[in-house]
Amino acid sequence: MTELVLQTTNYAFGGSVVARDQNGRPIFVQGALPGETVRAALTVDKDRFAHAYVTEVLEPAPERSVPHCPHYGHCGGCHYQHVVYEEQLRAKRLVVQDQLQRIGGLKDVEILPVLGSPEAWEYAQEAAFSPTAGGDLGYWFPRQREVMPIEACSITRPRIMTL
């Protein structure tokens, strides 16, 4: 698997951050924050873009935090647990703004700040579970083609997890 050292720039849709290779090709990096230097492994390598995930953070951003959930990075349920909560809200606003401007062509749209939950954990009132091969419920592993059974989720309300 090809690894690159990358300088990240801004948030992108789906929880990734944009970096560019030496030719200016965008690389969408999972697990990074804007302004970081990371070592990343390519998972998709196309002529016009690539996808990668962080294997090592060489220079962390000040907004980086330790993920709360032991499944983070393996489970596909969360994108931003490696980011302090206030920055998570900012990232979501910036992604919506970018999508409306760059894809939608709407330049003068005011995007209000995202309203956060009073609780940084166990706030989600819905979850998109899939059945595992054994009949349990879980989340899809990123970069793998199987569902990971989850007994506890750091962002989902505990009552939902009793299903």
Describe the predicted segments one by one.
Residues 1-163:
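Accessory RNA-recognition modules of RNA-modification enzymes
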